[in-house]
A protein has these predicted regions:
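Amphipathic alpha-helical dimer-interface segment in Rossmann-like NAD(P)H-dependent oxidoreductases
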Residues: 1-6, 45-46
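Short coil/turn segments at alpha/beta junctions that flank glycine-rich nucleotide-binding fingerprints
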Residues: 6-8, 25-26, 50-53
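Rossmann-fold scaffold of SDR-type NAD(P)-dependent oxidoreductases
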Residues: 14
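Residue(s) in the substrate-gating loop at a strand-loop-helix junction
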Residues: 17
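Active-site loop-to-helix junction immediately N-terminal to the catalytic Tyr of the SDR YXXXK motif
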Residues: 23-31, 43
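Active-site helix of classical SDR
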Residues: 33-36
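SDR active-site lid
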Residues: 50-131
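Short-chain dehydrogenase/reductase
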Residues: 133-144
Length: 172
């Protein structure tokens, strides 16, 4: 930032996520880090107003990467899921979802490649007046629209309705 201030211009691009403006069950740490990144990005944007430095948030959504495989490895390493009260949910839904999600109909229909995100980043670096936010995939654009028109209560109902583990009865 000091170099950008000195030269009078620059671009800071943060790679955020759809989970930086909505939350999904059982993804608390990831949700929290992306919400924090969005807050930090907004703060920087305000603090750097008038300096010639643009602060941009790129929100990819479903992109074909190794995130699911890596998430599964870290989940098994750091979460004592077999002793958790959520064991059934993890076993029946979350672990299989992380294993199989890349082959799901949803992802085949909506998932983009990393090059598509790179093109958006390249564009945001070179366009005269970049947007504050680039929502990359159709699901990200759709959910951004839903966040803007639904109450928090109705948004949560929508997210819960489309979250398989929440449809499973809890053990008492």
């Amino acid at each position: 930032i000091p170099i950008m201030r000195k030269q009078g211009y620059g671009r800071i691009i943060q790679c955020s996520s759809i989970l930086g403006f909505i939350t999904l069950s059982y993804r608390g740490p990831y949700n929290a880090t992306k919400w924090a990144l969005e807050g930090y990005t907004d703060t920087l944007r305000l603090e750097l107003q008038g300096t010639g430095i643009n602060v941009i948030s790129v929100r990819p959504g479903p992109i074909k990467t190794l995130i699911r495989e890596n998430s599964l490895l870290h989940f098994k390493k750091w979460v004592d899921w077999e002793k958790s009260y959520l064991k059934r949910i993890y076993q029946k839904f979350l672990i299989p979802k992380l294993k199989e999600e890349s082959n799901s109909f949803f992802n085949k229909l909506f998932e983009l490649k990393a090059i598509d995100v790179a093109k958006i980043i390249h564009h945001s670096l070179h366009v005269k007046n970049p947007k504050f936010i680039y929502n990359v995939t159709i699901p990200t654009k759709f959910m951004y629209f839903m966040v803007r028109i639904l109450s928090k209560k109705n948004l949560h109902k929508l997210l819960l309705r489309n979250s398989e583990p929440n449809q499973m009865p809890r053990e008492t």
